[in-house]
Each structure stands twice: as structure tokens, then as C-alpha cells.
């Protein structure tokens, strides 16, 4: 017998108690100095076991984290005084454990890491720390795992940031930070789109009318550049405040000379390959902006109402009119249009050759039936009230619908195919021109209208295509302001979208050509900046022909990874059906199209020499040179003697050509970057915008896509799924989310990490919601996550890596905890790789906040606080806690980097990477290496622990019953009885109840003072138990009983034990606490620092 135990030989009761203590697992470990931290420490050996394949059942519990939100294991019912020592919790009769004489022997948590985030001050402090130490560059430069390039789509430099910007930039930052932890060299160059109408309008709106009149192109450009640069600076500071890491000192701006030169180069390459041409054809035209627009510059708001009409044109003859001779001169072609103002430009009527058409006699008009139908205002034309005989040609299938629409009886007189009408002639309803009937395409259907289409090649894409086929005149009597020109005769000077439209309808009615006028609600294109309607108008423009490389583009699309996968369908449909791209704009603020025009013939001069010369000038002087330099200076040497014969073009390039050239201006020019990029990530609207313009320019010039993967996100809506609008008062401002508003109660300052947590929580592949309630929820989750990390820090205040307990020596509960952790990390890594951040959020929330806090942390408090500072069970628990802290920090760091860094800066122990390198900042850590030994936790034990945790939940239910009946207060006042007919389960439970390793005992897992496993159900014993319960587990019932715990309450750990009173020097202690006190006598009281609950 050792001298330690011999000292109790004179007291048999004390000797017996000490014999029990001797057999316990709470042995004292000798302390080790960590002043000289070695590379191969015990913790290093413990952590670094190598990458492994997944063992059987390795995902058993992780699936419950990530896919079964209401079925988390280890989730217990609510209990008061849950832990063995709850220093800051309530005790009966005002008792506080730390007020006793043994308070200095209790290892309470200590940390300088506060519960409150103080984001307003702490986050900027951390950002300053990162910036001063160039952490982003430092980590990227030191990584050696290859490069990763997420190419930034440039936002417009024309206003404050909104939640869409926040969603976009934070998603990018999460990806970049994850790749840093994966040992990649991350190159992220932020960009801004600085040209175009949006910025030009902002400048013009800020000027007085008189100042606008005096603006020269160069003065306007100077003001636009100044505005754009100022906005870039403001937006950049906001992005930094979001916690976004980027090369902020070297962003790319589309107004930079080197970028503009690269754009000119792309244009030149396309032109030299024959993909750029100039022609007169209908394009989207904005009268409010006085410029052509691309498809990506249009929007289709709800609620647009057009004035649609049914009109008739008098048939006068033609190739096959013999079959219609009997109806002449009272036969007409009936057409329907939603743009009556295009009637002056009518050049033909198109039919579908394969459809059946009928001559119908119009009879029995009833004015009472023509007022209002289905909330659509209908006004009949005078021709319907005319008593003369009237025959019209319409598609046969539409006769019933037109009868109802017009309020008439239509009697079919003759039926024939549309092909029979080709080359028939009719009289133009306004200027009496002789016009043909032509065969159109599949766009002519019987879904609406009359089956005959009014065709104006100068005002529609399909009409234009039909006009080319038949050589129809390209008439477009509309000017830049959207007003009729002199070519429109009596309508000249009238706005086609206003009084001009009304005037045309009135003229048709007065001349007996209007059958019906009707209000028609439909999608109609608006200028996305001025929010006003656009028109189709034929003008001289520069186009990029897509047809020459459409097949190559479609092939490239199929070789790109699209997230979500269905996005490939959208961009494929848009690309396969898109018309030629109108790339010229009639604005001043942009990159010029480098074309010179002959003064007399207007023929353009643009070849390899002229383009390269202009590119060279712009690369040095910027695109302003086009406006201030003479034609002679802008032309190459060999053309200067002809300079007087040419003038500079005034068109600028579409801003989508600007941003669509970024792969050339950035990826192809910046050191450290390469083409193609790994990822493009933008909103879903960019399928017809940046994704497509980048793809087209790249395929046309390089023959391949500029990206390997494309990720798209939805729009940000309010909590009710409504679009945000100032008028509705539902706008969420990212600045106010971070910094708070004037009323801190209504608009609290949440900080950037709460906003980032929200970004990770939503399934961004669709539209996402945000609002006050959602932000409060995110703040609550953040607070709980912070509390979990604070618990870990506090309980590792005296931890050193040399204290690590080898895996094989750990209690089973600790080995199980590491098995769970490894599967969580493995699952999270898979989610990061697949960009499924919302699943990561779910896993982190359930694992750290629910399962760790409610199970492992709950039962760990006993051995952490009272097991003895250097005891085996405390050190084994700290081994697990330190591993959890190091892993959790790394998996959450991409999402909440400020929190992760704040924790790291408060780390109470020194830690080095496996290669021996120090980690001054959290992102200097490497991603956790999967540990084969931890993942190989035996499958049968995995299943047993699942059953045990379910049993724990049922035990808590019975404890709650006992508590409600006032039999117990704390669960430590209880003794639990168990019985199951499952012999294997019973043996396992009995083994645990008698475990020498006290950490694995049932009473510690249930947080009760005693647990007894019954081999049989004796009536006498069962009747003495006050509260019982049972549940079905498999094919067997498990019986649970609860009674008052035996023995007295230990003053130090609050467990009930028959040993209390056995030690004369310490009569209020149980045997375990007595052994700890004897081995580690209490020191004089020292004030605890930042004690945790």
C-alpha cells in the first residue's frame, strides 16, 4: 500500500472509501511544461493520422445533422441545474457552489473572449489587423496547392450597395476563404463596370438644365469618370466592411486605359474574323435614353397595358384571287396588333402556309355585347356598325373566338390553305400602297389574333426576317425620340407611344379599317434604367453575328459545370435562339467603336491597321483620346493623307461588350491570373447578361469558354417574398444591418458576421428572403455559436498540446465524440466542394449549438470542473475539446471569419500546423485532415451509442416527471433504474454502469448520481420506485424508474454519494472529490477572471 493510502489505515471507514477511490479512473497526471513547443507533440500525433477512406456507418450520425432537422441525436429535454457543477446556475436556498470553501479547487472556465460580439468595434479592429498584416496576400502566397481564380463580375459604379450585392460578394468570399484553407493560391481581383447609360444618367440628373446644354462630350465624360471613381471608392469600403478579402489595391475598372485597349483588341479580333458588321435592322430602342439597347438591358414589369386593335385591309387581287372573285370588292384581310403605331410602316400581311383560313361573312353586330368582357375594355369600330355586306379572311380555328371577341356572327363561306393566299395584293390602309400577302414562319399560330400578321420589317425581328425573304421595303418612320418623322405624313411629330398611337387608331376607324380596339395586358420591354417603354426601330447599327460560332458556343456550354445544374437549360435556350447582338450605342460615355466613315459615301473604314493603331493610342491615353484627337492623328500613317475624307464615328460599345471582355482585360493581362477562370458567380439575370456576353466574345476569339464553372444565385426579396421597394418600405440596407439605425431597438447593429451567416443559411440557387425577423433569428444563432466557442475556450484555459491523451487511451464517449466530429467535417467539406452552403449552416447549427451543447458539453462539465486539474478524465475531455475547437474554427471561418479570428486571437494555447509552421491568424491553419482511426469507430458501437442517446432522451422524460412532482430538483438528486429484455443491450448497459472509466458511466451520461441496471423486474423493488416510464426499443420494452438518490450531497460536485461523511477532514465530500483535494490541496483564494456559466 502506498504511503498515500497508508495514512488512512487507522480509520477503516476512510480506508474503505479510499479503496473505492483507488479503483476510479480519476488518476492525477503529472504536469508538463510547454515552454519549448516541439513540432511532433502528442497532439500532433493525435491529430495527424492521415487521410482515409470512409468506414462502414461513417455517415450514420452526420446524416442526422444534415438531413433530419427534427431528429437530432442527443437532444435532451429541458432540465434545471443540468451539470454536475453549475457555478453560475441557481442552487437551492440561494446556494452557490463557488461560495463554498472548495471553490478554488473547482476548475471553472476562464477566458477573455466575451459573450457579446461588440461587432461595431471588434470587426473593424480585426479587419485592420488583417489589412496591416496583409493576411490575404500572405496566406495565398504561402499556399502551395495550385491556383484558384474566381473572376469577379463587375457591378455598376452608380450607387449604394443593396442586399443583392451583399449576397453576391459574400458568396464569393466564402468560396475564396475555403480555398485558402484548402492550400490554394487564391487570386481575387474585384472589378467595376464604369461606362454606359446608368452612370451617364446619374451625372445628367445631377446637373441643371443650363449646364447640360453646355456639356461637350469630353466634359460629360470627365464628370462621368469622376462619378464612377467616387462610387467605386464608396462601394469598395462597403465590400471591405462585409469582410470580403480581395486585391483591393489593384481592382480592375472598365475605364482603365489598359482594360479599354484589351476590349478594342477583342472587338478587332471579332471584326477581322467577320463576326462584326454594320447594317440597318430593327433593334430595341429606348426613346427615353435615345439609344439602342441589348436584350440584357430590358425588363418586363407587371401591369403593362397596350392598346391592341383588330384591323382590316382591302383585298384587291393577286395570283390566286380567282377563288375569291365572288367576294370582291367587299373582302378584307383581318389582322391583330398590339402596336397600332407601326401601321404606317406596314409592308405586307403574313400567313402560315399550312394553316386553314376561311372567308367569313360578318353579321348581326350587337353593340350591347361589346362594352366590357373579362375586365378588358373593348371599343367596336365603325365598320361593324356599317350595314354593308362585309367579308373577312381569318384562320378557321379562330372563328369561334373572334365571334365572341367582336360580338358578331361569323358565317364561313369558303375555306382554303394559307399557301393559296401567297402573292395576293391588298391596299395599304393609310397611304393606299399596293402590298403583298406573304408566307411567314412558325410564329404565326392560332393561339391568338386572327392568324394573319401585320408585317412591318422596320419594327420587328420576325417581320424583318420575312421582309428579307420577300425583298420588302424597310420602312421605319420614327426618330431617336420615338416620334413620327415626315415619312409618316400626317402623323409626323407625334410620339408613337402616346398621341401618335391614338391618332393612328382614330384614322383607321374613320376610314372603316378598325374592327375592334381592346386593352391588352401583357409583358412589354422597358428600359431597365429609365423604367420607360421601348420600341423596335430599324437603325444603322453595329452587330456581332452569332451564327458563325453558335454551334461552338452550344458545345462549350455543355462542357461547363453549372450550379444549379438546371441553369444549363436556361443559357442554352437563350443562346440557341438569340439573334445577332447589337453592340453599338448612341451615347457618349463608353469605349468608342473604332470606325471612320467616308464623308460622302458613309462607308466605314475599319481594318486591322486602323484598329490596332486606335488600340495603341487608347492603351496609353485612354478612350478620351477618340474625342480630343483629330482623325488624322487617330489614323495610321498610311491613311493620313486621306484623313480629310473621313470622320470619326460617334457610337460607343454596349456595356455588355465592356464587361464581356473582362476575361481578356483581366484574366489575360494580370500577373498570377490565368484563362479560363475556375468560377464565375453572379445573379440569375446574368444568363442573358455577363455570362452570355463573356461566353460569346471568348468563343468568337479564343474558341473556348472563359470559365470552367458558373454559379448563379437568385434575387433577394423581403420576408413575405415581395420585391424590395422604397415605396413599400421593405428595403433591407446592408449598411444598416451591420451598423444599425438611429433606433437601436428597431434596427440593431448586427455586424457583418450575422449578415454572412444569413448568406450561408439560404439556398441561394433560388430567390432568398430577408427581413427583421430573419435577422433576429440569425443573430440568435450567431450568439449561440459564439457561446459554444466561448465554452471551448474557457475550458481550455490551462490546456497545452503536451496534455493530449492518445486516442487509444480515451474513454469510449470521447472516441465517439471524435467519430462524430470527423463525419461532420467530412460532410461539411463535401458541401463546400459542391457550393451547398445552406447545408453547412444546418450542420454547424445542429452540431455545435444543439448536439455539443445539449449532450457532450452538458455531461463534460462534471469532469472538467471537479475531476481534478490534471486528472486523466479532465485531460481526455480537453483533448476532445481542443480538437473540436480547432476543427470548428476552420469549418466556420469562411462563413464567419471575424468570429473565427476573434476566437483564434484568444486561443489560450500555442498550436502549430502539421508541418510545424506557426499560425498567427486563423487562415494560416490548414483544412482539417480526415483521421482514419477516428472514422473507424466500430460499427456496432455506433449503433449502440445511437440507442443509448435515445435512451437518454427517454430517461430525461421520466426525470422531468419526477421534477414536476417536486420529488427532485436537480437531476443529480435522482437515481435511475433500467431494465430491458434485450440481453445484449442489458449487458452493455451493465458494463457501462460498472465502468472503471468514470467518464463512460451511465450516471455521468444521464447526469444523475446513480444508475442501477436491473436483471429482473421484482415487484417489491418496482413498487418502491416513485416515477416510472417505458418505451419500445426495437422489439423490446425498456423500463425506466426514478427515485431519490442515495447518500448525501457532496459540497464540491453536488453529486449524491454514500461516501459523504466518510472523511473526517472533509466530511462534506464524496470519495472522488476527496481524492482530488488530497492530491491538490486548495490554494489561497484568487479572484476568478471572466468565469463562465
Curated annotation (Swiss-Prot):
Pfam families linked: Anticodon_1, tRNA-synt_1, zf-FPG_IleRS
Residue numbers covered by motif 'KMSKS' region: 723-727
Keyword Transferase assigned: no
Main location: plastid
Residue numbers binding Zn(2+): 1050, 1053, 1070, 1073
Disordered as annotated region, ranges: 69-103
Ranges of compositional bias, category Basic and acidic residues: 90-103
Domain of life: Eukaryota
Motif 'HIGH' region, residue range(s) on this chain: 155-165
Amino acids binding ATP: 726
Subcellular location per the Swiss-Prot or TrEMBL entry: Plastid, Chloroplast; Mitochondrion
Name of the protein: Isoleucine--tRNA ligase, chloroplastic/mitochondrial
Native species: Arabidopsis thaliana
Amino acid at each position: 500500500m502506498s504511503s498515500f493510502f497508508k495514512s488512512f489505515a487507522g480509520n477503516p471507514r476512510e480506508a474503505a472509501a479510499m479503496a473505492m477511490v483507488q479503483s476510479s479512473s480519476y488518476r492525477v497526471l503529472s504536469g508538463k511544461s510547454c515552454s519549448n513547443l516541439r513540432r511532433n507533440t502528442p497532439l500532433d500525433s493525435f491529430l495527424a493520422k492521415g487521410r482515409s477512406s470512409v468506414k462502414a456507418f461513417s455517415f450514420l450520425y452526420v446524416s442526422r445533422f444534415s438531413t433530419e432537422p427534427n431528429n437530432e441525436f442527443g437532444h435532451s429535454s429541458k432540465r434545471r441545474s443540468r451539470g454536475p457543477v453549475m457555478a453560475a446556475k441557481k442552487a437551492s436556498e440561494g446556494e452557490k457552489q463557488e461560495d463554498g470553501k472548495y471553490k478554488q479547487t473547482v476548475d471553472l472556465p476562464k477566458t477573455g473572449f466575451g459573450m457579446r460580439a461588440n461587432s461595431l468595434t471588434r470587426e473593424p479592429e480585426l479587419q485592420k489587423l488583417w489589412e496591416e498584416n496583409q493576411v490575404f496576400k500572405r496566406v495565398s502566397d504561402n499556399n502551395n496547392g495550385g491556383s484558384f481564380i474566381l473572376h469577379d463580375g463587375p457591378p455598376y459604379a452608380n450607387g449604394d450597395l443593396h442586399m443583392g450585392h451583399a449576397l453576391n460578394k459574400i458568396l464569393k468570399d466564402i468560396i475564396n476563404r475555403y480555398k485558402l484553407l484548402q492550400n490554394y493560391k487564391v487570386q481575387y481581383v474585384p472589378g467595376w463596370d464604369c461606362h454606359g447609360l446608368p452612370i451617364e444618367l446619374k451625372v445628367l440628373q445631377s446637373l441643371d438644365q443650363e449646364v447640360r446644354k453646355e456639356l461637350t462630350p469630353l466634359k460629360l465624360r470627365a464628370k462621368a469618370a469622376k462619378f464612377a471613381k467616387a462610387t467605386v471608392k464608396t462601394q469598395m469600403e462597403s465590400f471591405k466592411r462585409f469582410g470580403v478579402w480581395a486585391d483591393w489595391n489593384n481592382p480592375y475598372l472598365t475605364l482603365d486605359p489598359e482594360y479599354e485597349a484589351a476590349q478594342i483588341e477583342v472587338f478587332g479580333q471579332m471584326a477581322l474574323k467577320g463576326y462584326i458588321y454594320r447594317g440597318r435592322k430593327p433593334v430595341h430602342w429606348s426613346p427615353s435614353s435615345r439609344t439602342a439597347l441589348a436584350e440584357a438591358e430590358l425588363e418586363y414589369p407587371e401591369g403593362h397595358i397596350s392598346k391592341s386593335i383588330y384591323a382590316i385591309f382591302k383585298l384587291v387581287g393577286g395570283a390566286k384571287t380567282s377563288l375569291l372573285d365572288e367576294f370582291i370588292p367587299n373582302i378584307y384581310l383581318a389582322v391583330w396588333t398590339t402596336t397600332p403605331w407601326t401601321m404606317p410602316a406596314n409592308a405586307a400581311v403574313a400567313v402560315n402556309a399550312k394553316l386553314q383560313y376561311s372567308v367569313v361573312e360578318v353579321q348581326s353586330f350587337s353593340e350591347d355585347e361589346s362594352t366590357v368582357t373579362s375586365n378588358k375594355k373593348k371599343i367596336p369600330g365603325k365598320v361593324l356598325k356599317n350595314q354593308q355586306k362585309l367579308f373577312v379572311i381569318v384562320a378557321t380555328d379562330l372563328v369561334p373566338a373572334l365571334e365572341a371577341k367582336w360580338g358578331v356572327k361569323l358565317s364561313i363561306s369558303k375555306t382554303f390553305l394559307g399557301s393559296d393566299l401567297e402573292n395576293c395584293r391588298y391596299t395599304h390602309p393609310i397611304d393606299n400602297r399596293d402590298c403583298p400577302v406573304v408566307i411567314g414562319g412558325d410564329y404565326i399560330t392560332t393561339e391568338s389574333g386572327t392568324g394573319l400578321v401585320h408585317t412591318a420589317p422596320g419594327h420587328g425581328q420576325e417581320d424583318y426576317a420575312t421582309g428579307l425573304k420577300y425583298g420588302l421595303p424597310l420602312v421605319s418612320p420614327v426618330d431617336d425620340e420615338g416620334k413620327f418623322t415626315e415619312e409618316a405624313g400626317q402623323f409626323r411629330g407625334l410620339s408613337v407611344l402616346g398621341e401618335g398611337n391614338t391618332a393612328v387608331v382614330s384614322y383607321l376607324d374613320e376610314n372603316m379599317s378598325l374592327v375592334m380596339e381592346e386593352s391588352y395586358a401583357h409583358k412589354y420591354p422597358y428600359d431597365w434604367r429609365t423604367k420607360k417603354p421601348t420600341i423596335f426601330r430599324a437603325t444603322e447599327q453595329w452587330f456581332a453575328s452569332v451564327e458563325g460560332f453558335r454551334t461552338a458556343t452550344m458545345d462549350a456550354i455543355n462542357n461547363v459545370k453549372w450550379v444549379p445544374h438546371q441553369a444549363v437549360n436556361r443559357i442554352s435556350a437563350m443562346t440557341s435562339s438569340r439573334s445577332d447582338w447589337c453592340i453599338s450605342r448612341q451615347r457618349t460615355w463608353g469605349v468608342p467603336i473604332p470606325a471612320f466613315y467616308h464623308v460622302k459615301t458613309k462607308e466605314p473604314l475599319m481594318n486591322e491597321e486602323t484598329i490596332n493603331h486606335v488600340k495603341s493610342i487608347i492603351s496609353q491615353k485612354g478612350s478620351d483620346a477618340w474625342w480630343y484627337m483629330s482623325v488624322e492623328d487617330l489614323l495610321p500613317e498610311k491613311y493620313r493623307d486621306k484623313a480629310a475624307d473621313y470622320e470619326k464615328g460617334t457610337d460607343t460599345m454596349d456595356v455588355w461588350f465592356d464587361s464581356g471582355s473582362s476575361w481578356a482585360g483581366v484574366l489575360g493581362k494580370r500577373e498570377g491570373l490565368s484563362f479560363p477562370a475556375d468560377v464565375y458567380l453572379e445573379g440569375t439575370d446574368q444568363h442573358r447578361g455577363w455570362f452570355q456576353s463573356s461566353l460569346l466574345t471568348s468563343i468568337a476569339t479564343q474558341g473556348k469558354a472563359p470559365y470552367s464553372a458558373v454559379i448563379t444565385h437568385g434575387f433577394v426579396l423581403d420576408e413575405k417574398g415581395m420585391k424590395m421597394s422604397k415605396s413599400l418600405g421593405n428595403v433591407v440596407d446592408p449598411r444598416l444591418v451591420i451598423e444599425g439605425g438611429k433606433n437601436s431597438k428597431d434596427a440593431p447593429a448586427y455586424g457583418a458576421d450575422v449578415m454572412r451567416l444569413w448568406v450561408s443559411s439560404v439556398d441561394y440557387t433560388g430567390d432568398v428572403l430577408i427581413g427583421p425577423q430573419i435577422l433576429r433569428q440569425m443573430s440568435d444563432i450567431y450568439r449561440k455559436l459564439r457561446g459554444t466557442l466561448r465554452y471551448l475556450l474557457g475550458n481550455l484555459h490551462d490546456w497545452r498540446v503536451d496534455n493530449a491523451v492518445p486516442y487509444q487511451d480515451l474513454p469510449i464517449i470521447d472516441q465517439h465524440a471524435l467519430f462524430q466530429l470527423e463525419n461532420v467535417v467530412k460532410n461539411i467539406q463535401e458541401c463546400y466542394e459542391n457550393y451547398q452552403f445552406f447545408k453547412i449552416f444546418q450542420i454547424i447549427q445542429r452540431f455545435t449549438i444543439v448536439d455539443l451543447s445539449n449532450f457532450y458539453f452538458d455531461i463534460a462539465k462534471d469532469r472538467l470542473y471537479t475531476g481534478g486539474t490534471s486528472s486523466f478524465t479532465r485531460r481526455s475531455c480537453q483533448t476532445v475539446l481542443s480538437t473540436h475547437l480547432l476543427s470548428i474554427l476552420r469549418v466556420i471561418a469562411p462563413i464567419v471569419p471575424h468570429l473565427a479570428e476573434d476566437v483564434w486571437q484568444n486561443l489560450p494555447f500555442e498550436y502549430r500546423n502539421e508541418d510545424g509552421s506557426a499560425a498567427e491568424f486563423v487562415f494560416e491553419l490548414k483544412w482539417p485532415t480526415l483521421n482514419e482511426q477516428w472514422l473507424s469507430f466500430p460499427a456496432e458501437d455506433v449503433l449502440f451509442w445511437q440507442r443509448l442517446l435515445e435512451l437518454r432522451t427517454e430517461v430525461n422524460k421520466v426525470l422531468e416527471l419526477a421534477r414536476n412532482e417536486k420529488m427532485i430538483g436537480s437531476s443529480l438528486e435522482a437515481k435511475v433504474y433500467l431494465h430491458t429484455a434485450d440481453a445484449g443491450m442489458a449487458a452493455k448497459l451493465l458494463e457501462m454502469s460498472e465502468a472503471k472509466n468514470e467518464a463512460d458511466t451511465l450516471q455521468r451520461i444521464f447526469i444523475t448520481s446513480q444508475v442501477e441496471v436491473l436483471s429482473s423486474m421484482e415487484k417489491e423493488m418496482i413498487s418502491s420506485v416513485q416515477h416510472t416510464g417505458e418505451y419500445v426499443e426495437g422489439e423490446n420494452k425498456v423500463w425506466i424508474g426514478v427515485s431519490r438518490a442515495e447518500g448525501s450531497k457532496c459540497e464540491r460536485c453536488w453529486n449524491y454519494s454514500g461516501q459523504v461523511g466518510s472523511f473526517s477532514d472533509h466530511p462534506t465530500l464524496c470519495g472522488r472529490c476527496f481524492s482530488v483535494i488530497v492530491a491538490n490541496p486548495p490554494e489561497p483564494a484568487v479572484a476568478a477572471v471572466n468565469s463562465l456559466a
